[in-house]
Amino acid sequence: MSLNVRVITPDRIVWDANAEELILPSSTGQLGILTDHAPLLTALDIGVMRLKTGGNWISFVLMEGFAEVEDNKITILCNGAEEGASIDASTAQAALEKVTLLVDEAATKKEKIEATIELRKAKARLQAVA
């Protein structure tokens, strides 16, 4: 038996297929989902989701949201998602370096918070291609 996984963003369905295993970046840490998992509703953090399908692992960067698990169906609603295979490692590394400077140069509390969120996104993108 497998898991039916749907990843939905405001503008498109990013993934709608079966998987054998799923690892989610929940707000309390990494969360592993296998078949016949107990029903669950959880908040998702910025991070990397990994799913195993056909014996291979596929990575996606998720930009916060929610996941519902029920009867081997996982619905993920998130603000944004990007498949790891579509991310260029050198571009992701350059973006991380640029955002790190923005965090250091942030003058106001608002700028610091915004730059820190962008830093978390950049780290997740780089982690997805690693």
Curated annotation (Swiss-Prot):
GO MF assignments: ATP binding; proton-transporting ATP synthase activity, rotational mechanism
Keywords linked to the UniProt accession: ATP synthesis, CF(1), Chloroplast, Hydrogen ion transport, Ion transport, Membrane, Plastid, Thylakoid, Transport
Protein location: Plastid, Chloroplast thylakoid membrane
Claim: RNA-binding is one of the keywords in the record: no
Superkingdom of origin: Eukaryota
InterPro entries in the record: ATP_synth_F1_dsu/esu (IPR001469), ATP_synth_F1_dsu/esu_N (IPR020546), ATPsynth_dsu/esu_N (IPR036771)
Iron-sulfur recorded as keyword: no
Membrane topology: Peripheral membrane protein
GO cellular component: chloroplast thylakoid membrane; proton-transporting ATP synthase complex
Homology family: Belongs to the ATPase epsilon chain family.
Quaternary structure and interacting proteins, as annotated: F-type ATPases have 2 components, CF(1) - the catalytic core - and CF(0) - the membrane proton channel. CF(1) has five subunits: alpha(3), beta(3), gamma(1), delta(1), epsilon(1). CF(0) has three main subunits: a, b and c.
Biological role stated in the UniProt entry: Produces ATP from ADP in the presence of a proton gradient across the membrane.
Name of this chain's protein: ATP synthase epsilon chain, chloroplastic
Gene that produces this protein: atpE
